[in-house]
Curated annotation (Swiss-Prot):
Keywords on record: Membrane, Mitochondrion, Mitochondrion outer membrane, Transmembrane, Transmembrane beta strand
Pfam families: Omp85
Subcellular location: Mitochondrion outer membrane
Protein name listed in UniProt: Sorting and assembly machinery component 50 homolog A
Protein topology in the membrane: Multi-pass membrane protein
Length: 469
C-alpha cells in the first residue's frame, strides 16, 4: 500500500514519573482497549482538506479527479482505503517517482473535532528519462533504446522516442500519449514510425513508414481501440532466389485504413494464466480513406483457462480470421494471414503452412487454429516456493489450416475448404515464465496431417514470445 501515516483522533493516555502517573495506577483492562479500537474504526470523520505536496510542473486540475473520492470517506478505515486507491491512481499516471500518504487531524480555524487532513507527498519524475531493455516477440528478440519526456505539458502527457533493433526487425518511432483527466483508460495517442522487417519464410523484405492516431476507451467490461493508420509500404526481395510470385509483389503501395479492436480479458496473467478468459476481436477496413489498397479484414482470438487438481491448468484456445479484397485488385502478401511455428501450430516451421511458391510462403486469406494444453508442476516439485515455480510441464494438441477462398462460392464451400487438409500436432515439453514479460517453451513435437509444401520441425522445437496458441 506504500507508506501511510495516521494519527489517532483522540489523545492517547500519557504516563511517566514526570507526570505523577505510573503504569501500575492506570486501568488497562480489555474493555477500554476495545472501546479505543471502536473509536478508531467506527467513529464518523470528515475529510476537510486534501493537500498534494511536491508538485512542480504538474497542473493541479489533472489531480483533482484522482483524489476526489477521498472526500467521500465516512470513517477512518474508509479514509485509509480511499487514500490508498487515490495513491494508486496517482502512480498510474506515470508522472511520479513515488507517492506517500499522511493522514492527520485537521488544523486551522475551521477545524472540526472529527475533521481530518490528508496529504499526498509526491516526487515527480525527471523531465527526461532514458531506458535500455530487451524484448521478446514472436520467436524474435530485440534490443530497445528509449527516451521519454513524462508529463511534458503538465497533465500526464507523454512524449516517447524509441529505437528497436531485432533479429528480424528494426524500427524507430515517435509517439505522443494523452489521457483524459479522471479517466486514464480513455486516452489518445499519435505515432510516427518507420519499421523494416525481414521475413525469410517468404524471401520478403518490407519497409513501412507511417502515421497513426488511436483512441482507447472502456465500455462496461470491454476495452475498445479505434485507429486510423496511413502507411507507405515498400516491398522487396530478400534474396536473389525469391520466387516470381514474391517478385510480383515488390514495389510501393499506400494503405490508409480504419481499425477497431475489442478486448475482454479476465485472466490473472497474460503470459501463463491459471484462470480466466480472453476474447479479442479485430476489424480493419482499408481503401475508403485513401490509398491504393482495399480490403476488409476480420480476426478473433478466444482463450479459456481452468485450474484443475494437483495445481494443474487446462487451457484451450481458438484463433480465426478472414481477408476479403475489395475491388478487382488481389490481396497483398503483406496483408494476408500466416500460420505455423512454435507460437501457433507447433511442429511446423515458422509461418510455413499453406500456399507457397518455389519454397516461399505467400500467406492465405482465411485461417483457423485451435489448441488444448495441460500445464502441470514439474515432477517431484523441485524448487517449490521459489525458482521452480517458474517452470511448468506442458502437454499440447494443436490443429489448424490456412488457405485462399473463392468468394464467389457460398459459406458452406468456404467451411468445407477450411476443414480440408487440416494440419495438427501433439507433444510435450517445458515452459518457463519470464515474469510478466514473455515465456519460453522447449517442446518435443510430432507433426501430423502434413501437406505437400509444408515445412515441418519434427522433434525438439524452441519458442519464445508473448502470444501463444
Amino acid at each position: 500500500m506504500g507508506t501511510v501515516h495516521a494519527r489517532s483522533l483522540d489523545p492517547l493516555p500519557m504516563q511517566g514519573p514526570e507526570l505523577g502517573v505510573q503504569a501500575d495506577d492506570m486501568d488497562l483492562g480489555e474493555p477500554e482497549r476495545e472501546e479505543k479500537q471502536e473509536v478508531l474504526e467506527n467513529k464518523d470523520v470528515v475529510v476537510q482538506h486534501v493537500h498534494i505536496d511536491g508538485l512542480g510542473r504538474t497542473k493541479e486540475d489533472i489531480l483533482t479527479y484522482e483524489i476526489a473520492d477521498v472526500f467521500h470517506a465516512k470513517n477512518l478505515i474508509d479514509v485509509m482505503k480511499k487514500s490508498h486507491e487515490a495513491r494508486q491512481k496517482l502512480l498510474r499516471l506515470g508522472i511520479f517517482r513515488h507517492v506517500e500518504v499522511v493522514i492527520d487531524t485537521a488544523e486551522g480555524a475551521d477545524a472540526l473535532p472529527n475533521g481530518l487532513d490528508v496529504t499526498f507527498e509526491v516526487r515527480e519524475l525527471r523531465r527526461m528519462t532514458g531506458s535500455y531493455n530487451t524484448m521478446v516477440g514472436n520467436n524474435e528478440g530485440s534490443m530497445v533504446l528509449g527516451i521519454k519526456l513524462p508529463n511534458v505539458l503538465g497533465r500526464a502527457e507523454k512524449l516517447t522516442f524509441q529505437f528497436s533493433y531485432g533479429t528480424k526487425e528494426t524500427s524507430y518511432g515517435l509517439s505522443f500519449f494523452k489521457p483524459q483527466p479522471g479517466h486514464f483508460e480513455r486516452n489518445f495517442s499519435l505515432n510516427l514510425y518507420k519499421v523494416t522487417g525481414q521475413f525469410p519464410w517468404s524471401s520478403l523484405r518490407e519497409t513501412d513508414r507511417g502515421v497513426s492516431a488511436e483512441i482507447s476507451f472502456p465500455i462496461w467490461r470491454t476495452s475498445h481501440t479505434l485507429k486510423w493508420e496511413g502507411v507507405w509500404r515498400e516491398l522487396g526481395c530478400l534474396a536473389r532466389t525469391a520466387s516470381f510470385a514474391v517478385r510480383e509483389e515488390s514495389g510501393h503501395s499506400l494503405k490508409s485504413s480504419l481499425a477497431h479492436a475489442m478486448v475482454i480479458d479476465t485472466r490473472n496473467s497474460t503470459i501463463l494464466p491459471r484462470k480466466g478468459a480472453l476474447l479479442k476481436i479485430n476489424q480493419e477496413l482499408a481503401g475508403y480513406t485513401g490509398g491504393d489498397v482495399s480490403f476488409l479484414k476480420e480476426d478473433f482470438e478466444i482463450q479459456l483457462n481452468k485450474t484443475l487438481f494437483w495445481d494443474s491448468v487446462l487451457s484451450t484456445s481458438l484463433w480465426g480470421g478472414m481477408l476479403l479484397p475489395l475491388g478487382e485488385k488481389a490481396s497483398s502478401i503483406a496483408d494476408r494471414f500466416y500460420l505455423g511455428g512454435p507460437t501457433s501450430v507447433r511442429g511446423f516451421s515458422m509461418y510455413s503452412i499453406g500456399p507457397q511458391s518455389e519454397g516461399d510462403y505467400l500467406g492465405g486469406e482465411a485461417y483457423w487454429a485451435g489448441g488444448v494444453h495441460l500445464y502441470t508442476p514439474l515432477p517431484f516439485r523441485p524448487g517449490r516456493g521459489g525458482f521452480g515455480d517458474l517452470f511448468r510441464t506442458h502437454f499440447f494438441l494443436n490443429a489448424g489450416n490456412l488457405c485462399n477462398l473463392n468468394y464467389g462460392e457460398g459459406p458452406r464451400a468456404h467451411l468445407s475448404k477450411l476443414a480440408e487438409c487440416i494440419r495438427w500436432s501433439y507433444g510435450a515439453g517445458i515452459v518457463l515464465r519470464l515474469g510478466n514479460i514473455a515465456r519460453l517453451e522447449l517442446n518435443y513435437c510430432i507433426p501430423m496431417g502434413v501437406q505437400s509444401g509444408d515445412r515441418i520441425c519434427d522433434g525438439v522445437q524452441f519458442g519464445a514470445g508473448i502470444r501463444f496458441l
